[in-house]
Design a protein with these regions (language model features):
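Short, hydrophobic/aromatic-rich segments at coil-to-beta transitions
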Residues: 78-82, 138-141
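Conserved FAD-binding catalytic core of PHBH/FMO-like flavoproteins
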Residues: 54, 97, 101-209
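General small-molecule cofactor/ligand-binding pocket signal
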Residues: 6, 63-65, 117, 202
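A conserved short coil-to-beta-strand element within the FAD-binding core of flavoproteins
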Residues: 66-81, 205-207
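Short, conserved active-site loop motifs that form the nucleotide-linked donor/cofactor pocket
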Residues: 62-63, 68, 222
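Active-site-adjacent segment of FAD-dependent monooxygenases/related oxidoreductases
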Residues: 1-57, 74, 157
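Conserved mid-domain beta->alpha element of the FAD-binding
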Residues: 52, 100, 201-203, 207-251
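Core beta-strand elements of the Rossmann-like FAD/NAD(P) dinucleotide-binding domain
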Residues: 88-97, 219
């Protein structure tokens, strides 16, 4: 699904870092001459998932089963046996290997009493996906202590369909429910833009982040990947990107 992702997404090479309103660092990562696709592409997760499902439909070796839930897993020396619950009932499924990609709260990891180790950071961040027509270049901009949001950090980059992802550091002591309200979000964006341009909020969320991982990613016939195995800061889509790297490594 690399081609539809690259063609629909926003390609970029330049990243700029500012301290207040002064640029202090800049990179320009050009793809190698023999690379077929750009080095970095920004694309909303729902489009990426659409591309994945479309590609899976072209591969007869993959059986994608919707509305199904793994309710138990049993291991032996040479296989894993899953109990699957679906609208038609419950059935068993055997596999030589089970790739566990069920997210940060991984029910399967918990079934086996396994844990992740690391640190949860006491900080909160506001994500706002904003639809607007802007003449900003398709670059990643990152500010420390900007005049429009003093004492915190802000991240800006472009996605498909004129959607701009803005990430505001808020600190730990804020009220997450209050900060998600439009009357709190809109003034922050207006202060950042510094003009009266029109924009529309597409999506708003508050998150905290952690840096944690399992001590071992392989447990018998189970192979843990993605957020089930390790959790990182979401900056730069590190969670999704590292999950893809995990599965590519297995392949």
């Amino acid at each position: 699904c690399g081609e539809p992702v690259a063609s629909r997404g926003v390609s970029w090479n330049v990243g700029r870092t500012f301290m207040r309103d002064t640029e202090v660092y800049r990179f320009d990562l050009q793809p190698d001459a023999d690379h077929h696709r750009p080095g970095m592409v920004n694309l909303q997760q729902y489009y990426f998932e659409e591309a994945l499902v479309a590609r899976i439909g072209e591969l007869p070796a993959i059986d994608l089963r919707w509305r199904s839930k793994v309710v138990s897993v049993a291991e032996s020396a040479d296989r894993a046996t899953l109990t699957i619950e679906c609208p038609d009932g419950t059935y068993a499924l055997q596999a030589d290997w089970l790739i566990v990609a069920d997210g940060a709260r991984s029910p399967i990891r918990r079934m086996f009493g396994l844990d992740v180790e690391g640190k949860v950071f006491q900080d909160r961040f506001l994500i706002a996906d904003v639809v607007m027509k802007a003449d900003f270049p398709a670059e990643r901009w990152f500010w420390f202590d900007p005049p429009f949001h003093p004492g915190q950090s802000v991240l800006l980059h472009k996605q498909a369909d004129n959607v701009w992802r803005i990430d505001f550091q808020l600190g730990w002591d804020v009220d997450p429910d209050e900060e998600k309200k439009p009357e709190r979000v809109i003034p922050r964006i207006e202060a950042m833009l510094g003009d009266a341009r029109e924009f529309e909020l597409e999506w708003v969320s508050i998150y905290t982040f952690q840096c944690r991982r399992m001590r071992e990613f392989r447990h018998g016939r189970l192979l843990f990947v993605g957020d089930a195995a390790h959790q990182v800061s979401p900056f730069g889509a590190r969670g999704a990107n590292s999950g893809i790297q995990d599965t590519d490594n297995l392949a």
